[in-house]
């Protein structure tokens, strides 16, 4: 059995997830448990929808994660936005726990409106620490790296600093690496040794043990473009570097999600399977 355990993104309704996993031959998935474009209880799955997913996955060895709101900004200069960000993530964690997901992944926020990125990072660290203290037991947040504009957490060093400074245990606060974001932020993943270099960078920063999952996306744009434009594995500027990451021994036991349409993900899974960077179960 070679390569990472890779799966797909599936939009609600949640009841469709068990069947789609069977259809695509995978056991890993990402979904959302509310409207990602708004704060508040919009698009929260109905109890019957949740129950159908849970029942459909009963007895199956699946791994799933929810993606938090795209509006999350724990570094916002506005207290209203910071508080809404915390409330949104807490609500997502509650639903995720109720339906058996591994946790919630999220982007920490932006430096915009602060005198320096360091000031924004300090505020985000404080709010993230407060959030972790309020998390329900048995739930987990996964900090995802970013790549655009004034977003925080664009480098391995910066996400590592956040994780260290918050100081939460790995089972409460882990790391999710998006390969497209990392490449777009300037960490070149297009070479055959991409997996070695990434594992080395994470180990050097002391966060390899916090790594919980991947968004295994290729990139439409060159390294360092600082734009989030996903491509199907093997069809972008990372190319075989995606396989180098997915097949690396340090990552091969982790789950990975292709953040693409099901049709595009199907091609990506075929590419990874062909080159030894994927297994479904």
Residue ranges and their predicted role:
Residues 7-13, 34-36, 69-71, 109-111, ...:
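Active-site beta-loop-alpha junctions enriched in small/polar residues
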Residues 19-26, 44-65, 92-100, 131-137, ...:
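Acidic (Asp/Glu)-rich catalytic clusters
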Residues 29, 130-231:
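Acidic/histidine-rich catalytic cores of soluble enzymes
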Residues 135, 262-266:
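C-terminal active-site-proximal or functional interface alpha/beta core segments in diverse enzymes
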Residues 1-68, 72-91, 281:
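N-terminal pre-domain/capping segments
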């Amino acid at each position: 059995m070679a390569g990472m355990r890779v799966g797909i993104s599936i939009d609600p309704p949640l009841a469709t997830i068990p069947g789609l996993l069977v259809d695509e031959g995978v056991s890993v998935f990402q979904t959302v448990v509310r409207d990602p474009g708004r704060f508040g209880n919009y698009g929260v799955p109905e109890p019957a929808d949740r129950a159908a997913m849970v029942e459909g996955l009963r007895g199956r060895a699946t791994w799933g994660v929810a993606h938090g709101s795209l509006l999350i900004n724990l570094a916002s200069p506005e207290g209203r936005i910071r508080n809404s960000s915390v409330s949104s993530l807490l609500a997502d964690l509650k639903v995720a726990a109720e339906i058996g997901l591994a946790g919630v992944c999220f982007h920490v926020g932006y430096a915009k409106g602060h005198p320096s990125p360091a000031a924004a990072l300090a505020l985000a660290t404080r709010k993230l620490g407060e959030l972790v203290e309020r998390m329900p037991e048995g739930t987990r947040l996964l900090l995802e790296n970013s790549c655009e504009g004034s977003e925080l957490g664009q480098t391995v060093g910066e996400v590592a600093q956040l994780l260290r400074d918050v100081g939460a245990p790995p089972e409460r606060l882990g790391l999710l690496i998006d390969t497209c974001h990392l490449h777009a932020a300037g960490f070149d993943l297009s070479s055959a040794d991409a997996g070695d270099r990434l594992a080395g960078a994470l180990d050097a920063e002391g966060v390899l043990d916090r790594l919980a999952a991947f968004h295994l996306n290729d990139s439409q744009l060159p390294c360092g473009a600082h734009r989030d434009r996903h491509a199907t594995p093997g069809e972008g500027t990372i190319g075989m570097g995606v396989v180098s990451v997915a097949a690396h021994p340090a990552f091969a036991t982790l789950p990975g999600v292709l953040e693409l349409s099901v049709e595009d993900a199907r091609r990506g899974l075929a590419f990874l399977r062909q080159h030894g960077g994927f297994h479904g179960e």
